[in-house]
């Protein structure tokens, strides 16, 4: 019964976050875990600047949930999230707020703390056009699982590609991660952790445009 309730809650969360046409594919090729997610949503009058400020609101990643296969329940994935001033000096600062006209490019650093890999600083790189936004999220230091290095620097990447048409927001997201060499008994666990985090980052943005 507990598992059924967890699945029902997950379905409810997914409907809230992905209230549009959506397909997700997860596969592994040449040791690289890949996630691809395509979706479309009603634009509802949102501007490029509106979407940009959803993406720069790094603190809103805090509390993002997922369904844990090991715990058989919906649980919090990112327990903390905030913008930092410098990658090597993780001092918390306010989220970046942008006004039109948007800059062509900006880089922001964010600290994300999660239940599996602990605290890690990521680089959020943005490219803005009139009706198009690309966000690349990359780890800038090794990510560890307990005492083991699970992911090398610059080996975890989420790419959010967002285009605005007259009536829709079209999302084409891709995630890539090549884990470090790990004991065979840990590979499946780490691969699942990677795909969960990619899907959660995609869902964070998509939830922001549907709430």
Question: Residues of each region from the PLM?
Answer:
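Surface-exposed amphipathic alpha-helical segments
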Residues: 190-211
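A mature extracytoplasmic/lumenal domain signature
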Residues: 128, 137-141, 173-177
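A short, solvent-exposed beta-edge/loop patch
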Residues: 158-189
């Amino acid at each position: 019964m507990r598992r059924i309730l967890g699945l029902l809650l997950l379905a409810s969360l997914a409907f809230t976050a992905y209230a549009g046409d959506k397909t997700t594919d997860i596969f592994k090729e040449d040791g690289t875990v890949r996630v691809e997610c395509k979706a479309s949503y009603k634009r509802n009058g949102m501007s490029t600047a509106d979407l940009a400020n959803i993406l720069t609101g790094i603190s809103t990643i805090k509390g993002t949930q997922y369904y844990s296969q090991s715990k058989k329940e919906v649980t919090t994935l990112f327990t903390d999230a905030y913008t930092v001033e410098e990658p090597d000096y993780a001092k918390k600062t306010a989220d970046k707020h942008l006004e039109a006209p948007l800059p062509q490019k900006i880089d922001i650093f964010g600290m994300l703390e999660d239940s599996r890999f602990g605290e890690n600083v990521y680089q959020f790189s943005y490219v803005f056009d009139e009706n198009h936004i690309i966000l690349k999220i990359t780890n800038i230091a090794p990510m560890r699982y307990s005492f083991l290095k699970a992911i090398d620097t610059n080996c975890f990447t989420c790419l959010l590609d967002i285009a605005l048409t007259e009536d829709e927001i079209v999302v084409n997201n891709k995630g890539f991660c090549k884990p470090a060499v790990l004991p065979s008994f840990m590979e499946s666990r780490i691969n699942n952790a990677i795909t969960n985090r990619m899907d959660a980052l995609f869902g964070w943005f998509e939830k922001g445009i549907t709430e």
